[in-house]
């Protein structure tokens, strides 16, 4: 007997239009009517998932940040797996040496050591990777500026103060223009 359906978001739950199809919504409702729980499982931060949950009136739990956080239906963290702050400093020392957009996913949202302009460039690179349906640089810029992830980004001006705060860090994300440099960074972090 099936007790739970857990679905990834991108390319599974949501389609290339970044919406949930009527067919998927009906399947979720049908499963729930049979007593089967539905959950979203994603590498995204919960703050990126919540608008979708609200828009489609989903009543579900969520595993976010590649398993780093588990949320109940009300959006409360039930379980979190976080990175030791000493390890965070080591990771940042390596990541901040290159030409990378560095994002830090925490229990209090996402942060970056980059400037707003650098973050926008990183969001545009990310959009070009994941949203091939856009047709021009102006569409990529418009998409990046309207993205809730960009709008809600927190900017770190003092890394020491940030690390002294009560923030809990679950994940790092980085994007670079050179695949070779990204591979080199990965090797340094291993």
Predicted regions and their residues:
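Small/polar loops that bind or transfer phosphate-bearing groups
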Residues: 16, 40-41, 174
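Asp-based phosphoryl-transfer active-site loop
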Residues: 3-18, 91
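Active-site phosphate-binding/coordination module
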Residues: 22-137
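Conserved acidic, metal-coordinating active-site core of Asp-based
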Residues: 98-100, 108-190
């Amino acid at each position: 007997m099936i007790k739970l359906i857990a679905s990834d978001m991108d390319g599974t739950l949501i389609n290339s239009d970044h919406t949930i199809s009527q067919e998927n919504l009906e399947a979720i409702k049908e499963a729930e009517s049979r007593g089967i729980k539905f959950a979203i499982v994603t590498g995204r931060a919960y703050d990126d998932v919540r608008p979708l949950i609200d828009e489609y009136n989903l009543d579900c739990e969520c595993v976010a940040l590649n398993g780093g956080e588990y949320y109940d239906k009300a959006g409360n963290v039930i379980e979190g797996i976080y990175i030791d702050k000493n390890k965070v400093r080591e990771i940042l020392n390596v990541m901040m040496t290159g030409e990378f957009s560095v994002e830090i996913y925490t229990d209090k949202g996402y942060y970056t050591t980059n400037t707003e302009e650098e973050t926008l460039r990183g969001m545009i690179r990310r959009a070009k990777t994941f949203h091939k349906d856009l047709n021009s640089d102006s569409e990529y810029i418009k998409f990046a500026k309207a993205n809730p992830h960009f709008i809600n980004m927190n900017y770190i001006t003092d890394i020491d103060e940030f690390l002294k705060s009560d923030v809990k860090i679950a994940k790092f994300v980085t994007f670079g223009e050179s695949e070779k440099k990204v591979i080199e960074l990965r090797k340094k972090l291993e």
